[in-house]
């Protein structure tokens, strides 16, 4: 029976990490809902406020690498606690900022602290959940998507009640602090609770220091070998760049596409608001997709094939999105959200599989930077293509990107038994390709 159910400790890890995922995506999605109001209040151009957002998003991606290192060194729960408190306090600072520069600095801090979650939270799950890890990743994905889904409504409700965009950040920051206290006080065996003294002394996480390799770690290298790099992991990281382009591009330009191609939105008195609501509704299907993506990984024998299946379906969907309008466009977009968002839990599952236990944090940090940091170039590319050729052509371009992602995903499967062995012999670093 223990094979089929998570232990109490595992469920504690899953819900704590997933709760952090919820608040992280909630904080990072609030901006799009209140951007117009902020720009008007501070007499800022959309270009200026867009640059502030770009800095925040870049730090959101870039911070994942050092966050991954810190999670490996000090323990996932400690670093995750810092992230939750940091992003919550930063949200309060955003709500209390008056003027362009205070807002820019506080939003940059928000992006930086939000970057901590993915490497630390996913490492927390990868190390703390031994069975049915796919289900755990699925729950984590669902809560993150739920945060994205509810953030615009939270912002709208706060503005309606308190007549200020600041209330959205202040209320979210206060809620985040409450969750941070819960995270800090909840005991997890094998994980250190947050302590300035422990971190100052450079203590390693007890569980990571005491543990050997898990059942999915690559075999240890013998002799003079100093490291192993699975070929599949290289292709997984490359796939993250391509999928990050798809994620940021589709999420950013759906409202513009709907304003242009959906008649009832085009003719509405408030097309921006209506396009935002429709985008939010379509993201709801991503909740189902994220759950299914985690669920299916515990059921299939070859999880490496699942991302390829996702992109095989998504590629023609992008082409159809670029060609259709009105009800057909809405229906196809819903299917896209349902299918595409099942990719992320599987990707996380595979990154955990192909990285050693002691380096889970760094592995997720690199993956997160590639996904959200480099993938964010989609906003610039999408803006150029939309200005020059129309937003529908940008979705045609993403069909091509998706086709390339499909080939990369297939490469993961066909190289899963190959690895590069690095060794140092008499001071000289050498490498060779080896089949397991």
Model-inferred region functions:
Residues 29, 57-65, 148-149, 283-291, ...:
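Residue-level signature of mid-helix packing/kink "hotspots" within the transmembrane helices
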Residues 62-99:
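Conserved MFS/SLC helix-loop-helix module at the cytosolic interface between two early adjacent transmembrane helices
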Residues 43, 75, 96-101, 130, ...:
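Helix-breaking motifs and short loop linkers at transmembrane-helix boundaries and internal kinks
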Residues 354-389:
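A late C-terminal transmembrane helix in Major Facilitator Superfamily
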Residues 31-32, 231-287:
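Extracytoplasmic gate region of multi-pass secondary transporters
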Residues 106-144:
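Cytoplasmic helix-loop-helix junction between adjacent transmembrane helices
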